[in-house]
Design a protein with these regions (language model features):
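N-terminal Sec-pathway targeting helices
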Residues: 1-13
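Active-site nucleophile loop of the alpha/beta-hydrolase fold
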Residues: 192-202
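Conserved hydrolase catalytic core segment
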Residues: 178-189
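Serine-hydrolase catalytic core
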Residues: 72-73, 230-299, 314-331
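Alpha/beta-hydrolase active-site loop
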Residues: 132-157
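Gly/Ala-rich beta-loop-alpha elbow adjacent to hydrolase catalytic centers
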Residues: 167-172, 176
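Residue in the alpha/beta-hydrolase core beta-strand immediately N-terminal to the catalytic nucleophile
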Residues: 163-165, 190-192
């Protein structure tokens, strides 16, 4: 039922927006204070040029936050954590709390247009500035940011002489995976992926029809408490998502065949479980396992099946089981 509603909502939203779209697609918000290409170096750019551009745009100040493990004597791993599309990066904290409790340091990154990752200027409303950054983003921008975050994680892991882990939800999982497959110097020892957006139900690609209007905002059906931009998601962000999926389909290779645990609700409104299983089989990813999530009875009615990132979205007991499975997977063959 929930999946049907999501599909109908997608159809209705796309049709309505196509009917009523006008020249002023920014809905009263202008991009005067932001340069959409300011964080988008070419793929051939060297690491230092990427880093310089990011620093100029306040990246290191606003796009990542470290959380250190509670074990002062031993760190068992260092994890890169990336959130989903138009999701508050802080919503990854329940996962991070379990990681740090288990002896894993975590770097929680915010993609451009999410959390505090936007150009901060005196006298400019934060919500508007964040949304403008969201409307100006591209998949390459997000990839560059994720790469910079990975370098920090790798450096700390090397210093501690511990494994590098990757934790990604939805869009975040896609970006981390594509980074792994595409960049020769990126490597994760183990991964835990939550509803990875590497496959979508075909109906959602209807949003591609809105590509000529990148600044147009598509309203979201998700609860405000999860949304980093409550007004909705810009078409530009959806285009970036589709670009990422397309890129990953081309780049996916045997390099990503490391111990990986995928958490997915079979009733997910956006990610087809069958598509994930087919991908694993086609790419011969014999170290990947799928963990089917069944939400508990204590979950609020109407909660998206795609949301499996905290106790509120899965149920308290189910969330505990998910976290136990995730940490057991990441810390395999290591003392707990």
């Amino acid at each position: 039922m929930k999946s049907t509603l999501a599909i109908l909502a997608t159809l209705v939203t796309v049709l309505l927006l196509l009917l009523f779209v006008c020249d002023d697609t920014s809905f009263g918000l202008k991009s005067d204070n932001l340069n959409g290409n300011s964080l988008a170096p070419q793929k051939s750019a060297d690491k230092q040029s990427v880093k310089n551009i990011a620093i100029e745009n306040q990246w290191e100040t606003y796009s990542s936050q470290w959380f250190y493990c509670n074990h002062q004597k031993e760190t068992k791993g260092v994890a890169l954590v990336i959130h989903g599309l138009n999701f508050r990066p802080t919503k990854m904290k329940p996962i991070i709390a379990k990681l740090t409790e288990s002896g894993v340091d975590a770097l929680n990154m915010s993609l451009r247009g999410h959390g505090e990752n936007f150009t901060h200027q005196d006298g400019v409303d934060s919500d508007k500035a964040r949304l403008e950054a969201f409307k100006a983003t591209t998949y390459q921008v997000w990839t560059n940011e994720a790469y910079l975050a990975y370098l920090q994680v790798r450096e700390r892991a090397a210093h501690k002489e511990v494994p590098v882990f990757f934790i990604g939800y939805s869009l975040g999982a896609l970006i981390g995976l594509d980074l792994f497959a595409t960049y020769q110097d990126v490597y994760y020892d183990r991964m835990a992926l939550f509803a990875p957006a590497i496959k979508l139900y075909a109906i959602h690609y209807l949003a591609r029809l809105l590509s000529p209007f990148p600044e147009l905002i598509v309203p979201s059906l998700a609860p405000d408490s999860y949304l980093t931009n409550k007004k909705g998601t810009p078409v530009a962000a959806y285009d970036a998502l589709f670009d990422g999926i397309n890129n990953f389909e081309k780049s996916a290779n045997s390099k990503i065949n490391v111990p990986t645990l995928i958490f997915i609700d079979e009733q997910d409104e956006f990610i087809p479980t069958s598509g994930l299983k087919n991908f694993v089989e086609e790419k011969k990813l014999d170290q990947w396992q799928i963990y089917t999530v069944q939400k508990g009875k204590d979950v609020k009615f109407g909660t998206f099946h795609h949301h499996i990132i905290d106790a509120a979205s899965t149920g308290k007991d189910v969330w505990q089981e998910i976290m136990n499975a995730a940490t057991a997977h990441l810390l395999n063959d290591r003392k707990n």
